[in-house]
Amino acid sequence: LVNYADLGSVKDDFMDEWDHKSNWSERAVLLRNVFDRLDSQGKLLVFLSGDVHCASAYRLTHERYRKARVYQLTSSAISRKPAPSASMLGISAGGELKGSKGVFGERLFALTGNKNFSLLRVRRQAGGQYEVAVDLCWPGEEAGSTIRKRLILD
């Protein structure tokens, strides 16, 4: 309904989403190329995006490209007023991506109702391997405190 009537003048916001039907064909081509390349190279890719309403992290997999390691990380600008907790209903629970046959998203984290930000860190380990970590952060109960959820992307 929003796409046709532009209720609340948010049509453009919905149309630029990763999951909007108008983006499926381009997204499918992009993901197919990413998965194909990463599967043969064994490297990790993180799509970074921003949203003024929420924070989330997903692991993306493809049924044909088992060695590819792909993640999607979304967080907010620190100063934005957060959306209500009820907006969690708009965050995907995961599953197969519509319009991208064989591509699945596994939700690792989701947060609404709080200001938030994320930190992405890449560190070289002793054996020459790299560790990629994401810290998703939001305000704690006490003034000046921060809660942090760390994800190690493997």
Where are the predicted features?
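Long, structured stretches of catalytic cores involved in phosphate-ester chemistry, encompassing
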Residues: L1-D154
